[in-house]
């Protein structure tokens, strides 16, 4: 064992002063299927290259004493980070489209300098699954983006195609199922992407839903199982219909919200369909959610459903990091601690097959967050964040404003420029 450990570390003794090599020493490390274990982590060239009980400090000049600290994978949130700055100003909103629906990918408009990104990064978030909101039958494509400092971010897209089923449409639920069955049949059997005259497909006498070539190509990826269909649905009977539709169409499915999922938890589990949800969403905001309850998350968890958590989407992008509060409350509601933390780290990556992130393991991207205490506790603070092995700037406008207006100066606050 000593020989193997020496062989692993030998190359790093040859270059002990590499600027991008970090040794995280003595932290409580959250490991897959284990939980927190005291370990040393060696990071180099953006990757986790060693996890040991003890790594000699001489391998790197960048040693971070993590004794008593908690080290987790960076948080993966579901949000509009980098795509919305102020919800009340349309010019700062890039998640919407009137031209495209199924083929709409808002990630091309990602703004890495958004103040919301700085805030969330300082709270332990290292990446986001971007949530679209196009105006057609489909909301658009989900995509994955890291939120590191600088102009270049790693992206993975598309992850899935988002739509809704239930009360969100004026037409009958039955008609909506017929519509999607007809649309899938058209794409599967009649659509030829090589023909110029197939550039648009209009459905219905009023042409209410328009599909461009780009949209139809996105739907084709769902049919060929290159990505899942993500359905925002809440009513128990609607959930069953969506499960039945996915089985008959032979497509991969992810449920979003599922406020009445607890009523059909066994059926969701048997179908092996994951659920993305806010554990605190217990208010019957519509007739689709009359049976919403705090017990939803614990019943789904007990049934064996894979879960991923987000914080209330209506709060905008700035508060996406509060997914840790959702996870902490899920523990109080009956979800195991390890599974709750996985629901904001590894589970989003597994659900959407996001490569090399979400867990602390050798060969994975060094997206790491160091906390001063239990990461699901409300008062815990983030001390250090790594994205792709690069130590991140954790300054944010909230802290800058606090520093400005709590500093004693000769002139009143109104005279301050900085």
Regions found by a protein language model. Give the residues of each.
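Histidine-rich, glycine-flanked metal-binding segment
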Residues: 29, 33-72
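His/Asp/Glu-enriched, well-ordered alpha-helical/loop segment
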Residues: 87-88, 92-96, 101, 228, ...
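Sec-dependent signal peptide recognition
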Residues: 1-9
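C-terminal cap of metal-dependent C-N hydrolases
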Residues: 27, 39, 362-405
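Polyanionic/metal-chelating signatures
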Residues: 121-253
């Amino acid at each position: 064992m000593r020989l193997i450990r020496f062989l692993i570390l030998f190359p790093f003794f040859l270059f002990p002063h590499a600027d991008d090599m970090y040794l995280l020493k003595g932290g409580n490390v959250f490991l897959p299927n284990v939980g927190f274990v005291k370990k040393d982590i060696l990071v180099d060239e953006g990757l986790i290259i060693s996890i040991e009980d003890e790594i000699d400090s001489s391998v790197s000049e960048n040693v971070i004493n993590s004794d008593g600290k908690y080290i987790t994978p960076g948080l993966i949130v579901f949000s509009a980070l980098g795509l919305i700055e102020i919800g009340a100003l349309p010019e700062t909103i890039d998640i919407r489209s009137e031209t495209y629906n199924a083929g709409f990918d808002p990630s091309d408009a990602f703004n890495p300098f958004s103040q919301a990104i700085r805030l969330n990064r300082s709270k332990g978030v290292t990446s986001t699954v971007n949530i679209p909101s196009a105006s057609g039958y489909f909301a658009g494509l989900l995509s994955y983006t890291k939120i590191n400092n600088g102009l270049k971010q790693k992206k993975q897209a598309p992850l899935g195609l988002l739509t809704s089923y239930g009360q969100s449409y004026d037409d009958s639920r039955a008609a909506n199922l017929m519509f999607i069955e007809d649309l899938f049949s058209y794409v599967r059997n009649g659509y030829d992407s090589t023909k110029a005259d197939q550039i648009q497909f209009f459905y219905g006498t009023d042409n209410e839903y328009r599909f461009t070539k780009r949209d139809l190509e996105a739907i084709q990826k769902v049919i060929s199982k290159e990505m899942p269909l993500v359905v925002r649905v809440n009513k128990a009977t609607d959930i069953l219909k969506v499960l039945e539709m996915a089985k008959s169409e032979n497509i991969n499915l992810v449920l979003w919200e599922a406020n009445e999922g607890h009523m059909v938890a066994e059926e969701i589990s048997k179908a092996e369909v994951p659920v993305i949800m806010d554990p605190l969403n217990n208010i019957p905001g519509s007739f689709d959610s009359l049976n919403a309850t705090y017990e939803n998350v614990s019943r789904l968890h007990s049934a064996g459903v894979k879960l991923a958590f987000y914080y209330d989407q209506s709060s905008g992008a700035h508060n996406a990091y509060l997914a840790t509060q959702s996870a902490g409350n899920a523990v109080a509601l009956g979800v195991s601690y390890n599974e709750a933390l996985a629901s904001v780290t590894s589970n989003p990556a597994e659900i959407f097959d996001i490569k090399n992130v979400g867990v602390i393991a050798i060969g994975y991207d060094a997206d790491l967050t160091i906390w001063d205490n239990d990461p699901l506790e409300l008062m815990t603070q983030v001390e250090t964040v790594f994205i792709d092995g690069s130590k991140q700037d954790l300054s944010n406008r909230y802290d800058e404003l606090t520093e400005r207006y709590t500093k004693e100066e000769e002139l009143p606050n109104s005279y301050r420029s900085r």
